[in-house]
Amino acid sequence: MCGASSGGSISYYWRMTNSELPNSAAGYFGSMAESYDSLIHRAVPRYDEMIARLLDYLPDNPWRVLELGCGTGNLSLQLVKAFPRAELTLVDASSEMIALVRSRVDGSLSGSASSVSYIQARFEDLDLPVQSFDLVVSSISLHHVADKGSLYARIRSLMSPRGRFCFADQIRGEPESNHARNWERWLDFCRERGHCTSEEIESLLQHAAAHDHYTTLTEHTALLSKTGFSEIDCVWRNWMWGIVTSTAS
């Protein structure tokens, strides 16, 4: 959830061996599926605002929607409400998260024409038909993928022409001094206001050291452009978190 790439600002705050860490991001989030909602609201400043702003920039009537990293369904539930006639495909690497989001989303479908399918898979392993989706969306998940160029190329292949790719995620600050400052502000937010326990903060930092890969906005923009996206914009930003929107060329 909260992290930095290897060798970055995370080294200021935490060092430990990989043998002591969860062996995958899916394993980490699977182990905390039931407590995830509480923690994300306490550990991510302005979380609800970020989700609301992401929804603001989605197209009006997409028919086929892919969500990458659906987690417990915080964004998924909003997608069902916003697009009641759409075909939704929700993807997460954690079986525990898929089970939880299925129970929440299926329970919200009464009276809705939405069709929802669920896939347990890593983003890199998705096997879906090309040009299958009008909208691809994600929230605080893409930073778990190291090779974003390959990921963006794969996402582009799944999208119909003029489809929209919009995501909220953690973005590496630039210059490096800004990245470090963002980390300091986040840690102050968690510690001084008592939003997270010391054990929760340590767990987040451990996860970050093992599994998170930050990308700057400049790098995101270049990779998206190179892999077939245009109209790229950062429409919201708060410390480490930001929202990026783009269109399949």
Residue ranges of predicted features:
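N-terminal, positively charged/glycine-rich alpha-helical extensions of SAM-dependent methyltransferases
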Residues: 12-35, 186
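Class I SAM-dependent methyltransferase SAM/SAH-binding core
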Residues: 66-68, 72-125
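A short acidic, Gly/Pro-enriched loop at the edge of an enzyme's catalytic core
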Residues: 128-135
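Core SAM-dependent methyltransferase catalytic element
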Residues: 223, 227-249
